[in-house]
């Protein structure tokens, strides 16, 4: 299923939960909406590239598996 940007934004806000939810939402939105690289996101959020990839993959799984 394809989502509009506004629908996807709302789904991310509603479905990405947890201890670091705000950070994870920001990372997922920057990656999906702005196309920011994993490397740049890692620098921006002071995380490893692997951590950023895991956040994005898990977030995409939550959003797109429904």
What do these predicted ranges mean?
Residues 60-66:
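C-terminal flanking helix
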Residues 17-24:
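Short helix-coil-helix linker/hinge
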Residues 26-28:
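Short alpha-helical "packing" element that flanks the helix-turn-helix/winged-helix DNA-binding module
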Residues 40-45:
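Short alpha-helical "recognition helix" segments of helix-turn-helix
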Residues 3-17:
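Short, Lys/Arg-enriched N-terminal segment that forms or immediately precedes the first helix
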Residues 30-35:
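Short helix-to-turn junction characteristic of helix-turn-helix DNA-binding domains
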Residues 50:
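Key DNA-contact positions within bacterial/archaeal DNA-binding proteins
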């Amino acid at each position: 299923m394809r989502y509009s940007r506004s629908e996807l934004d709302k789904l991310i806000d509603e479905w990405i939960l947890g201890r670091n939810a705000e950070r994870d939402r920001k990372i997922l939105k920057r990656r999906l909406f702005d196309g920011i690289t994993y490397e740049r996101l890692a620098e921006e959020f002071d995380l490893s590239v692997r951590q950023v990839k895991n956040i994005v993959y898990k977030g995409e799984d939550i959003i797109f598996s429904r």
